[in-house]
Amino acid sequence: RWALMRHHSGTHVILRAAKEVLGPHIHQAGSQLSTDTARLDIRHYTHITPEQLKQIEIVANRLVMENLPVMIKVESRTKAEQKFGFALYQGGVPPGKELRIVQMGAEVQACAGTHCQSTGEIGPIKLLRLEHIQDGVERVEFAAGFAALEAMQHIQTLLNTSADTLSVQIENLPASVERFFTEWKDQRKEIERLRAKIADLELSRLEGVMVNGTEVVIKQVDVSRKELVTVAGAVA
């Protein structure tokens, strides 16, 4: 229950952070909660950049550390709309003449879900993945509280394992991976060059014989399928 509450309150905080970073036009297109992770679909006119995602994460955690009270009250729909506007309706319009209003700082939504009593209870927020799911909608996957800690520990384990495998420090991983990838591409080109040379050598050794007035080339060669196609094409 606590994990779900942290993730639910986390969607409100991340949406507010997205508004601060990207602009007030940001609107929630949907969300999904679980105990391990949660996701928030955001309406935005263009792709969110990695730098913007980083800033959203910083702002979200700042709002958590401010320990803002989560205020919940019930108001008539008319009064709530007059006070807060239609931005109340994030992810859908709830039915009924009265609305349950959830407010965390400047973020105010009509919401019937369970929440933490303050943003500080959410704990750390870690944005895990960004996905462009359709035109105008970006999906942010995140973890909050102990789930965020577990996600960060998992990421750290992957980094440590990768660094140990390549025998480098973690901060040198990007450069090392790029170097290995460049070397792999160069070696692949060299292999292709040598295969072409082998095909040329095999071709130079072929001799034809006449069978019923037709020249036929028969030879068993130990080459790859690609090289065999090259040789056959040259003979033809």
Label every model-predicted segment.
Residues 1-42:
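Active/ligand-binding-proximal structured segments within catalytic/core domains
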Residues 4-9, 46-54, 149-153, 222-229:
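Ordered, soluble secondary-structure elements with a strong preference for glycine-centered loop motifs
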Residues 12, 40, 113, 140, ...:
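Divalent metal-coordination and catalytic microenvironments
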Residues 17-24, 55, 59, 63, ...:
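Generic non-transmembrane alpha-helical segments
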Residues 24-29, 68-69, 203:
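Active-site phosphate-binding and catalytic loops of NTP-dependent enzymes
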Residues 25, 35, 119-236:
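Terminal appendage regions of diverse proteins
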Residues 31, 114, 146:
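Gly/Ser/Thr-rich helix-start
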Residues 36, 42-133:
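Non-catalytic interaction/regulatory segments
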